[in-house]
Amino acid sequence: MTIERAYTASDGVVLLHGIGCTSRSMRKLERSLQQAGLTTLNLTYASRKKPLALLTEDIHPAIAAFGEAIRGSLHFVGHSMGGLLARVYVARHRPPRLGRVVMLGTPNRGSEVADLLQSSRLYRNFYGPAGLQLTTAEDETLARLPPVDYAVGIVAGTRALDPIAWRFVLPRPNDGRVSVARSKLEGMADHIAIKATHTGLPYHRVAISQTIAFLSEGRFERTTLMPPLNRPPGYPASQPNSPTAHPPH
C-alpha cells in the first residue's frame, strides 16, 4: 500500500484495483490524485483468492487506520471489481466521514463475458470465487446491499481490444468486458461514457480528470463529447453531493 502522509490534512482516497491486478494498475491515477492535493491509500488485495465479503474484511484494518489519519472526507475509487468491493465495504464498514465513490468500468449489473466463461475450469481456477460474483445473475452478497445513499459517479468505456467480446458477447456500446448499460447503478449521482478500453480506464487521461472532478464537485464535467446522464427507466435521480475473452477486472 502507499500512504502519502504529507497530505494528511486533506481528503483521503482509497484506490481499489480490479480482479487479477495489483495496486500498480492504479499508480498513474494515484499520482494524479496526489497532484490534486489528495491523500491516497492504494491497496493490493488477494482479488483471486476470496469472495467479496471476505476481501472486505481483509482491507478493513488498513482503511480504518487510513481514515483515522486524515482530517477530511474519505473517498473511494474502484476499477472494475474494485468498485463492487467499495460498495460492499461501505455497506459493512461505512466510514464516519464518507465522501464520494467513483467507479471505472465496474460491472454493477454483471458482465456477459463472465456468464460465458464461468463454467470453464480455467476461469474458475484463475479468477477464483470473486470471479463467479461478476456474472449477470445477481450474486447474493451484492443482492443484499442496501441502496446507495452516497454520491456515486460511474465512468464507462466504449472501446475494446477484443473484437469477439465486443461484437458477439456484449451489448454495445461496451469496453470489451462490461457494457455501458451494465455499468449503471440505481441511485448513482452521475454517469459518463468515454472512448477507453476496460483495462485502460485507470490510465486514461479523461477518466483520470473526470475522477478528480467528481471527487471535488460531485459531478462530472460536461463537454460536447459527453452527453448528459441518461438513466434507464426506473432509475431515480440522486443528488450529486448527497479464454479469448476475459472477465471484467
For each of these PLM feature ranges, what is it?
Residues 7, 13-19, 23-24, 28, ...:
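Serine-dependent carboxylesterase/thioesterase catalytic core
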